[in-house]
Amino acid sequence: MAQFYSAKRRTTTRQIITVSVNDLDSFGQGVARHNGKTLFIPGLLPQENAEVTVTEDKKQYARAKVVRRLSDSPERETPRCPHFGVCGGCQQQHASVDLQQRSKSAALARLMKHEVSEVIADVPWGYRRRARLSLNYLPKTQQLQMGFRKAGSSDIVDVKQCPILVPQLEALLPKVRACLGSLQAMRHLGHVELVQATSGTLMILRHTAPLSSADREKLECFSHSEGLDLYLAPDSEILETVSGEMPWYDSNGLRLTFSPRDFIQVNAGVNQKMVARALEWLDVEPEDCVLDLFCGMGNFTLPLATQAASVVGVEGVPALVEKGQQNARLNGLQNVTFYHENLEEDVTKQPWAKNGFDKVLLDPARAGAAGVMQQIIKLEPIRIVYVSCNPATLARDSEALLKAGYTIARLAMLDMFPHTGHLESMVLFSRVK
């Protein structure tokens, strides 16, 4: 007769170890060494000692969590946000801005094997002009949650304030919560986006069921009382304008219109400085022909056109190409053309590329630009500026240019997202004569 035994659950007591942190990685984690292995510990800073327990043990590294901090770094700051440590938006509010910039610059320098020439930064607080807040109805309390996701979770942190938002948007948070929490459609709301443009404030509400006339009236009254442009999104394709006109923002002496769903850089201050520095690095001359790849709706293309003889912007999203053309007309720029192209194909064979380009700028998404590096090399530009939101793909793509005879002339860390683990950068490549 067979006998079955239930296995006893094995309990393990995690050992507490004492470590000294000697570095901060670009994600804001303290870095220590233990038994010859690198240990990553969120919440700790260089020059701090702590008792920790290992939570994940890999062959090359381990992760740990703090049990007790034994000393404080002189660069430790008191987080401004009461939600820090729970909300997944920020990872580094406990570190001084100077330390954040140094650690990100060091990580970038290691990846690129080149010294960081400068840090392009602006105000460290109140910089974010766009926010997407998740909404969730709680049946038990009949309350509406509004906030950001918890770190490593799909749960929502109900936020009352957010000091990295521009002041106009942060001040709106309790008012938006009160308005949305009074709607009959509370349980059918997906998320709300708030955008601060030069033209004013936008609110885009995603709802998953039709809104009653009473709810629509409440929302419209709210938009008028707060001076908002209101947009309703019943699905991912439809956007209904309830109040307001085409939004726009000022950038580098130009006026750029955009659709509420279009991508715009969330940090207006750093964006303006980044564009100005890119033009300076390219050393644009009045006779230059310039190519802007992954151009979007013309964040770099249009300012380039104010200095060059001609500029070509190439983008893979048709709606952004159309918006770029519209903004060129709006700003009276007749020396710039936008093209919709598949950037995985050889753009050097297109008619608009037959005369070549003196200078090239590219600003790809996180996946990088592996498919176009050889095409850029074929064009033989004198200077190339590569703007990156992913240092790993930047380092990979740079290898092609270095092998083709280009050198890194300048490398900047863009502090586009202070207090977070996001690292953006910009590189100037010059052709060796």
From Swiss-Prot:
Gene expressing this chain: rlmD
UniProt keywords, alphabetically: 4Fe-4S, Iron, Iron-sulfur, Metal-binding, Methyltransferase, rRNA processing, S-adenosyl-L-methionine, Transferase
Record has 4Fe-4S as a keyword: yes
UniProt-listed PROSITE patterns: SAM_MT_RNA_M5U, TRAM, TRMA_1, TRMA_2
Name of this chain's protein: 23S rRNA (uracil(1939)-C(5))-methyltransferase RlmD
Chain sites annotated for binding S-adenosyl-L-methionine: Q265, F294, N299, E315, N342, D363
Family in the record: Belongs to the class I-like SAM-binding methyltransferase superfamily. RNA M5U methyltransferase family. RlmD subfamily.
Entry EC number(s): 2.1.1.190
Reaction(s) this enzyme catalyzes, per UniProt: uridine(1939) in 23S rRNA + S-adenosyl-L-methionine = 5-methyluridine(1939) in 23S rRNA + S-adenosyl-L-homocysteine + H(+)
Recorded GO MF terms: 4 iron, 4 sulfur cluster binding; iron ion binding; RNA binding; rRNA (uridine-C5-)-methyltransferase activity
